[in-house]
Design a protein with these regions (language model features):
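Structural scaffold elements adjacent to functional motifs in cytosolic proteins
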Residues: 41-43
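Rhodanese-like catalytic fold shared by cysteine-dependent sulfurtransferases
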Residues: 2-6, 16-39, 48-80, 86-119
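Helix-termini ("caps") and immediately adjacent flexible loops/tails
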Residues: 7-11
């Protein structure tokens, strides 16, 4: 690794795992992963909310359907799965569902509201 890449990776790791024992990630850290292409983003809001606007290339599975549809993400199980909703409440539930199924999932703190404020 070159000297420019190492600090970025350390920074992402600190932000990503900064909340000890909690499966969370800040919107700023999530944006870094998004920009690097090293994560899949899961929108757990309703279809209407998703259609009104979402993170580009995100996967949409409403949290109410996730217990039956989580297999759609099976090929990304070991990747970073960033779960988001509007503010972070539904995504916490979605994250817990995925964690129980063995996914490497993180709840994006503040949801889409914080994402939009982090650019």
């Amino acid at each position: 690794m070159n000297t420019r890449t190492t600090p970025l990776i350390v920074f992402i790791c600190l932000l990503f795992w900064g909340c000890e024992n909690e499966a969370v990630i800040t919107a700023s850290a999530a944006r870094l992963l998004y920009d690097s292409g090293n994560a899949v983003f899961l929108d757990v809001r309703t279809k209407t909310e998703y259609d009104d606007g979402h993170i580009e290339s995100s996967v949409h599975i409403p949290v109410s359907e996730l217990p039956l549809r989580y297999q759609e993400l099976e090929d990304r199980k070991n990747d970073h799965v960033i779960v988001y909703c509007r503010s972070g409440n539904r995504s916490r539930k979605g994250t817990n569902i995925l964690l129980e199924k063995g996914f490497n999932a993180k709840n994006m703190l503040g949801g889409l509201i914080e994402w939009n404020n982090s650019d």
